[in-house]
C-alpha cells in the first residue's frame, strides 16, 4: 500500500487538539503558563509554522546528522587533534561548554512547556521537535566534553557549572532562567526563539564554527554547525507568535523584544565577543565581533523590526556605540579576575594582536590600551600580584555583570534606585529601565556581591569567595600562555636600550 503524501494528512495531524469536558480550559491551560493575556483563544488559529516536517522526515534528517557528527568526532579523538590546538582557542571551547551546555538542557524544559501549554495546537505539536532538538544538543555537548575530560578538567564544568555559584555562571543562568523558565509561552517564544536563537545564536554557533575551523578544531566546528542547523529551524517558532502579537498586542511584543535584546546582547558580549576578539588565534580570525554583530545581528534585527512594523529599541544609539567597547571591558575584567573563572583566559594583547585590535577598533588604545600597558609593566617587573584582585567588582542587579562593562572607561557611572528600602545598582540606564518595568521580577535576586556583603559567603575573603563558587586549584583560571605575550614588550624595550 502506497504511503499518503504528507500534504494529504499533515494538517489533520498537526491540528489535533483537546476537547475538554471534565475540566475548565483555564485550568488545563493556566494563563501564567500560556501567556495570551487579552488575546482571545481563536486568534491563535492564525498561528502557522514557517516550516513543515513530519516525524518520519525529522528522524531521517537527524539520523544523517548524527552519523556525520559521530564519524568526525571519532576520527578527531583518535587523531588526538585537540592536543595540537592553540591554547587560546581551547579557552573558547571551555567557556562555551561551561556556559551553554546546561542552557541547552534548560531549553528542553522550555520546549516541553510549549508542548503542554502553548495556546495553539500547531505550536504544541511543533514544540515536540524542539524538545528533541534540545535534548540532542545537550547530549552532543556532554559527549564532546567527556571525550576531552582527560585533556582538561575544565570540561567537567560543562555539566558541573550550573550546579555552582561561579559568578559568570550565575549571570548566564539568571538570564536563561528568566527568559526560558520564568517566562510564559508567548514571552519565551519572542525572547528566546526569535531574539536569542534566531538572532544571537547565529553568532555563537556560526561565528565560532567558522573560527574553530580556521583554528583547526574540526570536531568543535562540526558540532557547532550541526547544532546550528536545528536552531535555525525551531528558532522560527517566534515568527508566527509575533504575527499574532502584532495583530492583537503590539505594545507587549515591542517591550518583550526590547528587553530580551539588551539582556541577550550583554551576555553574548562576554561569551562570544571575548572569544572572537581575544581567544581565537589572530591569524585565524575571520572578522571582529563588531563586524559580525553589524552583519548578522544589527541588519537582521532591524529587518525584523521593519518587516513587522516595530520600532527600534529606544536605546539603539547606545547599543551601537557600545559595540566598540563593551566586550573589551568584559575581557579585561574577566582576565583580571581570572582566579574566579573555570577556564584559562588569554590576555590577547601581544603586539600583533594589539595591531589587529587597533585596526578593528580605532578607539581601543585610548580606552583599553593604557590599562593593558599598566598590566604589562607589572608583569614584566615581576609584580604579578598587582595584576590579581584583592576584592570583588560591583555587579549589576539585572545583568549580573560588572558595573562599567557595557561601554568604555569614560562611562563608568552606575545607575541606582531604591526599591522597598533596598538599593539596586545597574550597569546602564537600559538595565535600570528593565528593572523598573517589572521590579518584582528582579527584586528578589541577589548577585555574588549582595551575598558577600550579606554574610552568606564565609570567610569574607577572595579565598572564601573562590571556595563558595566551587572553584578548585586545577580549574581556577590563570593566564593561558603564562604571560608570554607580555614578553613582546620586555624584549623590545631591552633591544631599544
Curated annotation (Swiss-Prot):
Inhibited by propyne. It comes from Xanthobacter autotrophicus (strain ATCC BAA-1158 / Py2). Fe cation 1 binds at residues 104, 134, 137, 231. InterPro entries: Ferritin-like_SF (IPR009078), Phenol_Hydrox (IPR003430), RNR-like (IPR012348), YHS_dom (IPR007029). Keywords: Cytoplasm, Iron, Metal-binding, Monooxygenase, NAD, Oxidoreductase, Plasmid. Disulfide bonds: none annotated. It catalyses: propene + NADH + O2 + H(+) = 1,2-epoxypropane + NAD(+) + H2O. It is an enzyme of class 1 (oxidoreductase). This is Alkene monooxygenase system, oxygenase component subunit alpha. Signal peptide: none annotated. Transmembrane segments: none annotated. Pfam families: Phenol_Hydrox, YHS. Fe cation 2 binds at residues 134, 197, 231, 234. The lineage of its organism: Bacteria, Pseudomonadati, Pseudomonadota, Alphaproteobacteria, Hyphomicrobiales. The keyword Mitochondrion does not apply. Binds 2 Fe(2+) ions per subunit. The two iron ions could form a binuclear cluster. GO terms for molecular function: alkene monooxygenase activity; metal ion binding. The alkene monooxygenase multicomponent enzyme system is composed of an electron transfer component and a monooxygenase component interacting with the effector protein XamoD. The electron transfer component is composed of a ferredoxin reductase (XamoF) and a ferredoxin (XamoC), and the monooxygenase component is formed by a heterohexamer (dimer of heterotrimers) of two alpha subunits (XamoA), two beta subunits (XamoE) and two gamma subunits (XamoB). Its EC number is 1.14.13.69. The gene is xamoA. Belongs to the TmoA/XamoA family. It comes from the Bacteria. It is found in: Cytoplasm. The keyword NAD applies.
Amino acid at each position: 500500500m502506497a504511503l499518503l503524501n504528507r500534504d494529504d494528512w499533515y494538517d489533520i495531524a498537526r491540528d489535533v487538539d483537546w476537547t475538554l469536558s471534565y475540566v475548565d480550559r483555564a485550568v488545563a491551560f493556566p494563563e501564567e503558563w500560556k501567556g495570551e493575556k487579552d488575546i482571545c483563544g481563536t486568534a491563535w488559529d492564525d498561528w502557522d509554522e514557517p516550516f513543515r516536517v513530519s516525524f518520519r522526515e525529522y528522524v531521517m534528517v537527524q539520523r544523517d546528522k548524527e552519523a556525520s557528527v559521530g564519524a568526525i568526532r571519532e576520527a578527531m579523538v583518535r587523531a588526538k587533534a585537540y592536543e595540537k590546538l592553540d591554547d587560546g582557542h581551547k579557552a573558547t571551547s571551555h567557556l562555551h561548554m561551561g556556559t551553554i551546555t546546561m542552557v541547552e538542557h534548560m531549553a528542553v524544559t522550555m520546549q516541553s512547556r510549549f508542548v503542554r501549554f502553548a495556546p495553539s495546537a500547531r505550536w504544541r505539536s511543533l514544540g515536540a521537535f524542539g524538545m528533541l532538538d534540545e535534548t540532542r544538543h545537550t547530549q552532543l555537548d556532554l559527549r564532546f566534553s567527556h571525550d576531552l575530560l582527560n585533556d582538561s578538567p575544565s570540561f567537567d564544568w560543562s555539566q558541573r557549572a550550573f550546579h555552582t555559584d561561579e559568578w559568570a555562571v550565575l549571570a548566564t543562568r539568571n538570564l536563561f532562567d528568566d527568559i526560558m523558565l520564568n517566562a510564559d509561552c508567548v514571552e519565551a517564544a519572542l525572547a528566546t526563539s526569535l531574539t536569542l536563537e534566531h538572532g544571537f545564536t547565529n553568532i555563537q554557533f556560526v561565528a565560532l564554527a567558522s573560527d574553530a575551523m580556521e583554528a583547526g578544531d574540526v570536531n568543535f566546528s562540526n558540532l557547532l554547525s550541526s547544532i546550528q542547523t536545528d536552531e535555525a529551524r525551531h528558532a522560527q517558532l517566534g515568527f508566527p507568535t509575533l504575527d499574532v502579537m502584532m495583530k492583537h498586542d503590539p505594545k507587549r511584543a515591542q517591550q518583550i523584544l526590547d528587553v530580551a535584546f539588551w539582556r541577550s546582547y550583554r551576555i553574548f558580549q562576554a561569551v562570544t565577543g571575548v572569544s572572537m576578539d581575544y581567544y581565537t588565534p589572530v591569524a585565524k580570525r575571520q572578522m571582529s565581533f563588531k563586524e559580525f554583530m553589524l552583519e548578522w545581528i544589527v541588519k537582521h534585527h532591524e529587518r525584523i523590526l521593519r518587516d513587522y512594523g516595530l520600532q527600534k529599541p529606544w536605546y539603539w544609539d547606545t547599543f551601537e556605540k557600545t559595540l566598540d567597547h563593551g566586550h573589551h571591558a568584559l575581557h579585561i575584567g574577566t582576565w583580571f579576575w581570572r582566579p574566579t573563572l573555570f577556564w584559562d583566559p588569554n590576555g590577547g594583547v601581544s603586539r600583533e594582536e594589539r595591531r589587529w585590535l587597533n585596526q578593528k577598533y580605532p578607539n581601543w588604545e585610548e580606552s583599553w590600551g593604557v590599562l593593558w600597558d599598566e598590566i604589562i609593566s607589572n608583569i614584566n617587573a615581576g609584580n604579578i600580584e598587582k595584576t590579581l584582585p584583592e576584592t570583588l567588582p560591583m555587579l549589576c542587579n539585572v545583568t549580573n555583570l560588572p558595573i562599567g562593562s557595557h561601554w568604555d572607561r569614560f562611562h563608568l557611572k552606575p545607575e541606582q534606585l531604591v526599591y522597598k528600602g533596598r538599593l539596586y545598582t545597574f550597569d546602564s540606564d537600559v538595565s535600570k529601565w528593565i528593572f523598573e518595568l517589572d521590579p518584582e521580577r528582579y527584586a528578589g535576586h541577589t548577585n555574588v556581591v549582595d551575598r558577600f556583603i550579606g554574610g552568606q559567603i564565609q570567610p569574607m575573603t577572595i579565598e572564601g569567595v573562590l571556595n563558595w563558587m566551587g572553584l578548585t586549584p586545577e580549574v581556577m583560571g590563570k593566564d593561558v600562555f603564562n604571560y608570554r605575550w607580555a614578553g613582546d614588550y620586555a624584549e623590545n624595550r631591552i633591544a631599544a636600550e
